[in-house]
């Protein structure tokens, strides 16, 4: 396609050494939950203040190569009236956009869901490109306690593949994200088995839809035991299982694998990423974290202008920790108790 070279260049830039993605594409409702946790009302002004804090962290671009935005943010300005997209570009951070329309029940399945958003996606993607976005994200989920049924896996894979083809057609590098939810009592071997099945289907349909592998990025879940499982897995074990999965299922043509944190604590997410980068990989193995980058910063800010600088330093510390983990050089110095806290049961975006 006409964007082929540009797609490859964008994907390679996002997957550059020591850098990863800041996911800040929470919907307004989810952003509201985050604000609520620090006692703030969910108003556009408060969302704008928080997003301004995130994108204006000095030197953030040294550790962050891309930022995923919610549609409101792509068209929003900072508190002092600069376009958020422009601020990111000045920071050397590529703007991205969440394009899916969320999850709805999948009729005919075992109480599972599927992802909406293909209708009108081509014209929306073209508009997002015009607005400065250069990559896209589509998140679908697979639930292990509910099966997953063959139907749900097929629907997830097909939807992702259609979205990826449409994105590339409009100049956006698609981030392919079939999140295998942490919920459940299953052990790590069961997660591994399901993940193999999911990624086999995803790549089958990506190929069927003529998606250019050099111009995509992946956002997988790490292979871990279920959140309610009796077993806990060390970073070494998580890395062993996850890399084994990637080696079996992900072609080396794919430039970058940007893991989601999916409810791990901030420190856990960094330790696991570090363990995966202890030896060389055929792809850039990095991060695309939301809560695992933002959590301590949010709590530090608390909605108070006088805390902005400290909150920005907290975010930079996390970004730098994950940058070191991408290089396999993270040692875990200076971590706060907040950063070590487990997230939550029934974690959802």
From Swiss-Prot:
One MF annotation (Gene Ontology) recorded for this entry: fructose-bisphosphate aldolase activity
Disulfide bonding pattern of the chain: none
Catalytic activity, as annotated: beta-D-fructose 1,6-bisphosphate = D-glyceraldehyde 3-phosphate + dihydroxyacetone phosphate
Pathway: Carbohydrate degradation; glycolysis; D-glyceraldehyde 3-phosphate and glycerone phosphate from D-glucose: step 4/4
Residues forming the catalytic site: 177 (proton acceptor), 219 (schiff-base intermediate with dihydroxyacetone-p)
UniProt KW keywords: Chloroplast, Glycolysis, Lyase, Plastid, Schiff base
EC number of this enzyme: 4.1.2.13
UniProt xrefs under CDD domains: FBP_aldolase_I_a (cd00948)
Primary localization class, coarse: plastid
One Gene Ontology term from the biological process aspect of the record: glycolytic process
Residues where substrate binds: 47, 137
Annotated site, Necessary for preference for fructose 1,6-bisphosphate over fructose 1-phosphate, chain positions: 349
Protein localization: Plastid, Chloroplast
Gene Ontology, cellular component aspect: chloroplast
Family recorded in the similarity comment: Belongs to the class I fructose-bisphosphate aldolase family.
Record-given protein name: Fructose-bisphosphate aldolase 2, chloroplastic
Gene source species: Pisum sativum (Garden pea)
Organism lineage: Eukaryota, Viridiplantae, Streptophyta, Embryophyta, Tracheophyta
